[in-house]
Curated annotation (Swiss-Prot):
The keyword ATP-binding applies. It is found in: Cytoplasm. InterPro entries: MnmA-like, MnmA-like_C, MnmA-like_central, MnmA-like_central_sf, Rossmann-like_a/b/a_fold. This is tRNA-specific 2-thiouridylase MnmA. Residues 134-136, 288-289 are annotated as: Interaction with tRNA. It comes from Campylobacter curvus (strain 525.92). Disulfide bonds join 92-186. It catalyses: S-sulfanyl-L-cysteinyl-[protein] + uridine(34) in tRNA + AH2 + ATP = 2-thiouridine(34) in tRNA + L-cysteinyl-[protein] + A + AMP + diphosphate + H(+). Keywords: ATP-binding, Cytoplasm, Disulfide bond, Nucleotide-binding, RNA-binding, Transferase, tRNA processing, tRNA-binding. Its EC number is 2.8.1.13. Catalyzes the 2-thiolation of uridine at the wobble position (U34) of tRNA, leading to the formation of s(2)U34. One of its GO terms (biological process) is tRNA wobble position uridine thiolation. One of its GO terms (molecular function) is ATP binding.
């Protein structure tokens, strides 16, 4: 089978290509230029080309910067401006990696696209990886169901520690295998504020108010805060911690309260992506990547692609713009963005 492999020059994508080639498939690699971080692509392309030579495969360089800006970067900046907390990786997987790159793979005669994600496809469902510490099912929950037949994830049934061990036997990787584990958002060097500062003045001091709208303190600019944050603002004469409950971007104002005030049982979603036919069901949900699963009852409005999630217990720090993912056991059955 002819398979296109998304390649970054890192351990996971290299081992993905190696595993598939050793299984007898015809492999081509593709490196995606997604953003304009200085020096980032030159080093990665050098690595990818070395890996390509080692494996004896053709490597494509695909410039997707315009598409990445449209579907990932610009919404990231816009949502923070609106006082929300975006999830760029979920959008990138949907529109770029398993969108634009998949189209490129098909145009080049490939039957499948493979990536180094730690996730499985079982019975047509995105399913949690065998290695729970590396599971990326959450970030693939917005990928359309019809795409899943065209993608494979060879690392989904493997443990990261085993992949690292196998990688030690690959001489080309040993030259640059000391690179840190890639995590967080690829185009953010240190903090998201650095990105926003390129577009806006984020240092706009404003009022901190309580739930009733009374001014009780000052903050350094609303874009510095996300729901649940408890530092970086002043509450006059406060002796107990205060948490950000809401961000009123239009007023440059943050609403704060106690930890109990953060608690929420009803979560409304938009841009819902469904993997099942039912519009009412019981499930477990994650309101952000690292949060524990909570039992919930869900009602979907298919026409408007919205949902109401009733949690069985209070969740803290439910943030607009974050992805809520619904699971039946280990399989993803739906997802939507918190509104």
């Amino acid at each position: 089978m002819k398979i296109m492999v998304a390649m970054s020059g890192g351990v996971d994508s290299t081992m993905t290509a190696k595993i598939l080639k050793e299984a007898g498939h015809e492999i081509e690699g593709c490196y995606m230029k997604l953003h304009q971080k200085p020096g980032y692509h030159e080093e990665n392309i050098r690595k990818v080309k070395k890996v390509g030579e080692y494996l004896g495969i053709k490597v494509h360089i695909l410039d997707l910067q315009d598409k990445f800006n449209e579907f990932v970067y610009d919404p990231f900046v816009r949502l923070y401006k609106e006082g929300k907390t975006p999830n760029p990786c979920a959008l990138c997987n949907r529109f770029i990696k398993l969108g634009a790159l998949l189209n490129f793979a098909k145009q080049n005669g490939c039957e499948k696209l493979a990536t180094g994600h730690y996730v499985q496809i079982i019975d047509g469902f995105v399913t949690m990886a065998k290695d729970p510490s590396k599971d990326q099912s959450y970030f693939l929950a917005q990928v359309p169901k019809e795409v899943l037949k065209d993608v494979i994830f060879p690392l989904g049934d493997k443990f990261k520690a085993d992949i690292k061990e196998l990688a030690r036997e690959v001489p080309v990787l040993n030259e640059f295998a000391t690179q840190p584990e890639s995590s967080e958002i690829c185009f953010v060097e240190d903090t998201y504020i650095e990105i926003l500062n390129k577009h806006y003045n984020t240092n706009l001091p404003g009022n901190v108010v309580d739930k009733n709208g009374n001014v009780i303190g000052r903050h350094q600019g609303y874009m510095h805060y996300t729901i649940g944050k408890r530092r970086g603002f002043e509450v006059f004469g406060a002796h107990e911690p205060h948490f950000v409950l809401k961000i009123n971007a239009d007023k440059n104002e943050i609403v704060v309260g106690s930890k109990d005030d953060l608690a929420q049982k009803i979560v409304e979603l938009e841009n819902v992506n469904l993997f099942i036919d039912e519009d009412e069901f019981e499930c477990e949900t994650k309101i952000r990547y690292r949060s524990p699963k909570l039992e919930a009852s869900v009602k979907i409005d298919k026409q408007n692609k919205t949902a109401v999630v009733a949690l069985s217990q209070n969740a803290l720090g439910v943030a607009q713009g974050q992805l809520c993912v619904m699971y039946d056991g280990e399989r993803v059955i739906a997802s939507g963005f918190i509104k």
